[in-house]
Amino acid sequence: MKIRFFSDAYKSKRASHRLRGDVTCQALLEQGYDAKILTDWSEVDADTIVIFLKRSSVASIQRARDQGAKTIYDLCDNKFEEKGEYEPCCQLADLVSVNSVNMGISTKNFTGKNSIVMPDPYERPKLSPRFAPGVDINLLWFGSQSSFKFLPILEVWSRLEKEIGNYCYTMISAKTDRVLGKFKLRQAKGAVSGINFDRLDMREWSWELQGQLLEQTDIVLMPVLTENPRTDTKSANRLIDSLISGRFVITTPLHSYLEFAPYTWQGDYIEGIQWARNNPEQVLDMVTQGQKYVEDNYSARVLSKRFIEEVIDQLRK
């Protein structure tokens, strides 16, 4: 049996392709499966399972089916009302996989189809837990450009300046210069106030830079706006990558985050920063336990094995 991963616009820089394609594929390969990213369509036949990742088309799924393959359509964004291909891709594929329980519920509501939940695995190397802030506490946020939509950015910047004072907030994503430029212009015009740009460090994301900053930071600070219906279907990938990196996470209690509540602060972020400063030993203990939990339950090896076994079981029915 061959397992192939495909997207019509495959890009390893895209987190969903990297985690649900590259990382998962490599884990299956290391366990003895014939798994790879699909580049040669002549390989696709009746002995093939093709997993279609983000930005796949109905035409590609049909092509695989025409060549005799079993097909899985993988969803990790709750955009059924925006992306016209989602529903027909789900209907055409033999199976649907999703990145969270709530994404599965949304998929069922929109398509009537059940799905296999395959959480995102961690991809970062394990680092020693550390929490030893100096006079200025180092805070880190990382995410895709679209993740800015779900961050109460102006509120966070203003509250950090008013209520914390001694901090450096580093934020890495795509096109951060545009975000920074927009808010500098708005503050210059008097449309907003209270932002201390000297305490903000906004940089262009790269996988390597994220790793360097995780080593240096004290806290991963990533509050989330919960009013948007897309937020509660998200996976916990940023949280688990932070924990495996040995860093304390302060965030918002999304559904996929709740199982990590014993190891993170999920609530008011200013209170969380203040509590962490006052309880460094407890922070270290939480991070250490959280890191072990992630290592035991969210490795690509564990998740990919469980996933492919469920896929094979479902396809036999």
Please report, for each region that a protein language model flagged, where it lies by residue.
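N-terminal pre-catalytic "stem/leader" segment of glycosyltransferase-like enzymes
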Residues: 1-56
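Conserved catalytic-core segment of nucleotide-activated headgroup transferases in glycan assembly
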Residues: 7, 11-27, 124-127, 132-216
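Extended catalytic core of nucleotide-activated donor transferases of GT-like folds
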Residues: 35-107
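Alpha-helix capping/helix-boundary segments
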Residues: 42-43, 56-57, 102-104, 123, ...
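Donor nucleotide-sugar binding/catalytic pocket of nucleotide-sugar-dependent glycosyltransferases
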Residues: 94-128
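A charged, aromatic-enriched C-terminal amphipathic alpha-helix characteristic of glycosyltransferases
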Residues: 125, 278-313
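Nucleotide-sugar-dependent
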Residues: 148, 201-212, 220-241, 251-261
